[in-house]
Amino acid sequence: MEMKDFREMPYARPDLEEYGKQARKAARRLREANSYAEAREACFEQQRLENEIGTLYAIASVRNTIDTRDAFYEEEIRYLQEGLARMTPIEKEAMEALAGSPFRKDFEKEFGAQLLKETDTSLKTTDERLIPDRIREGELCQAYQKETALAVIPFRGVECNFYGLLKHMESTDRMERKEAFRAWAELYARISPKLDAQYDELVQLRTRMANTLGFPSYPEMAYLQRGHYDYTQADTAAFRKQIREIVTPAVAELRERQRVRLGLDRLCYYDEALLFAEGNANPEGTTEELVAKAQQMYQEMSAETGEFFNFMVKYHLFDLETRPGKRMGGYMTSFADYQAPFIFSNFNGTSADVDVLTHEAGHAFQGYLAMRSIPVSALTGSTAEINETHSMSMEHFAYP
């Protein structure tokens, strides 16, 4: 598909009924294939259909998170989440056709064992009995996202959202820091009844989903959904133990050094964000200037990173500044049909803005390369844990 500026990427509600018919037809072709060539062609037709829907979903999702107040994209996300959940039987049919294909070993030989391992695992957590709960799960996640995005509070004459308070939380004025943290807490206190109700329902819903599929609790199901084939709950428990025994004492030592640097008798929770008595090292310049400096850095880093970031800038594949109604946090996503990553963030005038241009860019660089070198879309991503090696590595590469 011809590349377009993100602001000009077209979105039209997809015909999910027609998508279902075509997906079922591709699954049947895969199941009835008489040769590996036929099976392979059917598999890639299925991928083409999924990428087409996935690209539209990603465009709608990004635009929804940019402004959660936009009624059009809010409704589109609701339509897509519900419609795709109802496609579960067709989704499972396609996976069963691949997993049970007589040409399974041919697929593994060409694309590696991971593709079929992921398919086999997904089959364990895909069931049409979960359709109502999957729909409700999507609704709850959207509601939580919107609730936090719309939260604002007056602070020193300015109406601030969560990200608007962050710079004040780093102030060299201790009272300002304390007031900012209390405003942050007050923001959460105001919306906590709704957030608590949403979270409670989500816990019960996910437990019910897991029990329906025969899992004793949600974590067992979630580990499979997240691609943790070898990394078990026992490994997580061992990691928590290491955090408590090794990392926590090291952090306590760093906090003590910070207390001394700040000249405080006691380091309080509202002091932790200020690293130096003279103030934190915050970025100078506008968003456009920061992006231009990042572009220069990536061009100097390597030919590959330069090409990648030039692509991001040329097609405006960012939405960086915090604003009213914008979802909290930061993320990288991708538009498969365009082989294009996208970076979402909430710039707020702190060093975190620079972190975004390295951390999220690390995710985006991995996606940019993977979409151009790996023919199977399902293999262009990884688990959340492995993905962080891409982002954190880029942070280290970018250090002076």
What label would you give each PLM region?
Residues Q258-F276, F311-E321, G381-I386:
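A glycine-rich phosphate-binding loop feature that marks nucleotide/adenosyl-phosphate handling sites
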Residues Q233-A234, R257, R261, M301-E304, ...:
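Inter-helical turn/loop segments and adjacent helix faces that build the functional surface
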Residues M1-E284, K293:
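A well-structured
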